[in-house]
Amino acid sequence: MKRIGIYAKCNHPDAVMVARDVVGWLRGRGLEVFLEKKLAQDVGDAEQSHDRGSIPGMVDLIIVLGGDGTLISVARQVCGRDVPILGVNLGSLGFLTEITRGELYLSLEKVLKGEFSLSDRMMLEAVVWRHGLEAGRFSVLNDVVINKGAIARIIDMEVSVDTAYLTTFKSDGLIIATPTGSTAYNLSAGGPIISPGLHCLVVTPICPHMLANRPLIVSDTACIRIEMKLRDQDVVLTADGQVGMALEAGDVVEIRKADRCTRLIKSPSKEYFEVLRTKLGWGER
């Protein structure tokens, strides 16, 4: 690996400081470093300043300095290129950014020697159809959420799995999550935690009107089709809680497994269930 891209949470002073140190460390080893323009400005180094979206196509490795939100944003930029991502946690929870600040340079040494393993994380593709035409398309690492606005009423959503009608959810919203996203909004809404190696997705209603409506796990080969049965309501679709669009009556949302995945470099010192236990504060035996 000779060409390294760095993304950081630029409004986080620690992230900018760590980025500056990492740039010096990498260049001291003869490696070429690529920075997004805002980060290059913040660290005072315009030598390799590039548009955010162009970096994944130019590098062999991406380092993300921040939290899970920063990494999720970068994952959409990578868009299926076979570029591994090393996530360094400078935030709070950090399910995806497994590497701690103290482990950063030891982990980098191992990665540059090729001594690392990858966790391939399934992604989703969500398409919004309006009057038979594509109105929006989103790549998703964590979840697709359909949610009501501040003063909207309960939403009616007719849901099918492939061609089979499932039910019409009457709820505050609906979450379609990957195994990676099962520890995000899905978990808060009472959905199950799913090991990232499993090939499935979970459909979780948000505050359903019917107590019998419960989260449903389906195969990752399924297409989830959601038809909006709205009555002049304020309803939005969000992808990973970061981008999205307003939905209208009659809109159809189709969600399926994407052709691409996100490749995360695993921590050399932690297993998934150790991370889970630590982050959720589960007790020891």
From Swiss-Prot:
Primary enzyme class: transferase
Any one GO molecular-function label of the UniProt entry: NAD binding
Active site positions: D68 (proton acceptor)
Catalytic activity: NAD(+) + ATP = ADP + NADP(+) + H(+)
InterPro entries in the cross-refs: ATP-NAD_kinase_N (IPR017438), ATP-NAD_kinase_PpnK-typ_C (IPR017437), NAD/diacylglycerol_kinase_sf (IPR016064), NADK (IPR002504)
Keyword Transferase listed: yes
Family affiliation: Belongs to the NAD kinase family.
Name of the protein this chain belongs to: NAD kinase
Organism from which the protein derives: Syntrophotalea carbinolica (strain DSM 2380 / NBRC 103641 / GraBd1) (Pelobacter carbinolicus)
Upper taxonomic lineage: Bacteria, Pseudomonadati, Thermodesulfobacteriota, Desulfuromonadia, Desulfuromonadales
